[in-house]
Curated annotation (Swiss-Prot):
GO cellular component annotations of the record: membrane
BP term (GO), one: lipid A biosynthetic process
Name listed for the protein in its UniProt record: UDP-3-O-acyl-N-acetylglucosamine deacetylase
Active site residues of this protein: 265 (proton donor)
Gene name per UniProt: lpxC
This protein's UniProt keywords: Hydrolase, Lipid A biosynthesis, Lipid biosynthesis, Lipid metabolism, Metal-binding, Zinc
GO molecular function: metal ion binding; UDP-3-O-acyl-N-acetylglucosamine deacetylase activity
Disulfide bonds: none
Pathway, per record: Glycolipid biosynthesis; lipid IV(A) biosynthesis; lipid IV(A) from (3R)-3-hydroxytetradecanoyl-[acyl-carrier-protein] and UDP-N-acetyl-alpha-D-glucosamine: step 2/6
Any single Pfam family the record assigns to this protein: LpxC
Top-tier EC class: hydrolase
Residues binding Zn(2+), per UniProt: 79, 238, 242
Requisite cofactors: Zn(2+)
Length: 305
């Protein structure tokens, strides 16, 4: 039986909020089987919980933001959510003493280290997957994203920025998902932004924690980070990271083919909602025998950084 996974122990880290610029403490705790992914704001009295759910994503302007019925929000969840998807963590309580998850270095890599440091424990309950049965496509102008059936989880992402530092040879990335592939190829890819946009956001009291330490920053001609890029195609890899985090808002690893052109948090979420709303387009499955499971999901807890 392919089993559900949680953490062996709780673990804590402190970072900076991307938009507030304030110190944020993040605590990750083990959870019982079938709990799912639960975000919790402990700075509220009483604490407010946000189960990871496609319908709870109600703001995708600058990041993926969960908002409850009372208008309380928790922002910038996508990088941590991607790390959970990458390592196949089904059940976890995520506590944060602020309205946003700390940005860390702008990638999912610090969260991978944190989760592996806490340890991953299998639970004696079958892990469930969402298997795509029929094609689903969402379009917005020239942007689009789609799911198709596939025996595994394949991602194909294309960006299209007209910028001297983003050549046409680094605008597409394709990956067959596995924990190993995610950790080595995707998790270290950092978020990025353009200097003129960051300056405007900061003038509006946003992105106050944004810096060259937690983002790739571009002016009109070049990349401003002294150390350059971690991968020549780091920007499109980060967009794939975002998509993995956004799609894991359903709470299950996906078995299917995901392809996107110029997609972002909003379109990723619309695609996920469209899939879940069409009951004939997907099914919830579990596997008794490792021989039956797509290869990429066989041993998500065993990775080498």
């Amino acid at each position: 039986m392919i089993k559900q996974r949680t953490l062996k122990q709780s673990i804590k880290v402190t970072g900076v909020g991307l938009h507030s610029g304030n110190k944020v403490t993040l605590t990750l705790r083990p959870a019982m089987p079938n709990t799912g992914v639960i975000y919790c704001r402990t700075d509220m009295n009483p604490p407010v919980t946000f189960p990871a759910n496609a319908n709870a994503v109600r703001d995708t302007m600058l990041c993926t933001c969960l908002i409850n019925e009372d208008g309380v929000r928790i922002s910038t969840v996508e990088h941590l959510n991607a790390a959970l998807a990458g390592l196949g963590i089904d059940n976890i309580i995520i506590e944060v003493d602020a309205p946003e998850i700390p940005i860390m270095d702008g990638s999912a890599s610090p969260f991978i280290y944190l989760l592996l440091d806490a340890g991953i424990e299998e639970q004696n309950v079958a892990k469930k997957f969402i298997r795509v049965k029929k094609p689903i496509r969402i379009e917005d102008g020239d942007k689009w994203a789609e799911f198709k059936p596939y025996d595994g989880f394949r991602l194909d992402f294309t960006i299209d920025f007209e910028h001297p530092a983003i050549g046409k040879d680094v605008r597409n990335y394709v990956m067959d998902f596995s924990a190993q592939a995610f950790v080595q190829q995707i998790s270290r890819a950092r978020t990025f932004g353009f200097m003129k946009d960051i300056e405007y956001l900061q003038s509006q009291g946003l992105a106050l924690g944004g810096s060259l330490d937690n983002a790739i920053v571009l002016d009109d001609y070049r990349i401003l980070n002294e150390d350059g890029l971690r991968f020549k195609d780091e920007l499109v890899r980060h967009k794939m990271l975002d998509a993995i985090g956004d799609l894991y808002m359903c709470g299950y690893n996906i078995i299917g083919d995901f392809k996107a052109y110029k997609s972002g948090h909003g379109l990723n979420n619309k695609l996920l909602r469209a899939l879940l709303e069409n009951q004939e387009a997907w099914e919830l499955v579990s596997f008794e025998d490792k021989e039956e499971i797509p290869q990429g999901y066989v041993s998500p807890a065993q990775v080498f950084i």
